[in-house]
């Protein structure tokens, strides 16, 4: 840590062309914290992990606890992601009529929230943004055609497509999205304006 080299890529030893070893050095305390309160990308990074050697009998148990969907966080995450979706669509997209950067940002946030909500309803860990869309596409339980529609929306960014996406998700989900809008606004403020008050990962990586 003193040299800021706890992560590195090692080339030249992998058994397939273009391959490399993605190395991250972790302490036992890191593993314990990841098992107790790790973010979903952290937990997902341990999927299919194996302990090849350890003189510490606790390591294997700690590693096994990490790549597990956290049911206790599900309700709060559903509220947070739906609140973000609600504000992104109803306020930023429909009321603010964004252009340029903000239009791209809002469109991607709408898609991001829908994808994260679908993962939560399936109790599937969020891997990372790079793998998010392919993970959702691989699920059987999802709104029919949602990935194709979201990709089209990201490219064209029209009101008609935004409305179609929202309607498709609303007709599929089992989440109670008919709550008082004030609850969604309150949660949005907590997640985006007051996040520094609470010991929790930012919504984008939670």
What residues fall within each predicted segment?
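Extreme N-terminal leader/anchor segments
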Residues: 1, 6-7
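Conserved NTP/Mg2+-binding pocket subregion across the NTase superfamily
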Residues: 7-99, 200-205
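Conserved nucleotidyltransferase catalytic core and NTase-mimicking acidic/glycine-rich helix/loop elements
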Residues: 67-206
